[in-house]
Amino acid sequence: MAEEQISFDIYQPFGPSVLKTKLPQIYVDALNKQSDDILNDEEKSKERDWSHNLAEKEKKEISIDHMAINGLPEFLATISKEYTKRVLPEYLPENTKIAFRVWTVSQWAGDFNPMHIHDSNLSGVCFLKIPPE
C-alpha cells in the first residue's frame, strides 16, 4: 500500500468502541466493479451466493475476493491494527494473525438488517452505493 495517511476517529457511544474512517475511493470503485461484474453474471452470482451465511435473506448477497483488490487487504489490516492498539493497550500486532471475509449486501428501500452476532473479534461495514435522498 502506498504510504498514505489514514484518517480515522474512534467513538465509544455505548459499550464497544467504534472506528469511523473513509474508505479511499479507489477501493470503493474496485469493490463496486467486482460486485457489479458478479451480479451481472448469473453463473458467477450463483457461485458467489453468500445469503446462507447472513442474518437477513436479501435477494443479492455475494462474497467478494478482496485479495484481488490491490492494497485493500493492507488498508483493512492497518485500520484493524490501529483500532485494536487504541482500545487494547496490551495488544501486540506482531503476535496477531489477521484474516478477513468480505461480502456485499444489496438492499433497497424498506429493507433492514436484523440484530445479529458476528463470530469474529472485529466486524465492519462499508456503504458503497447510497442513493440520493
Where are the model-predicted features located?
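Non-heme Fe(II)/2-oxoglutarate
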Residues: A2-L92, F112
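A generic structural micro-feature
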Residues: P13, E94-T96, H116-S120
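A short coil-to-beta-strand element that immediately follows conserved catalytic motifs
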Residues: E90-V102
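Catalytic core of non-heme Fe(II) oxygenases with the double-stranded beta-helix
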Residues: R101-E133
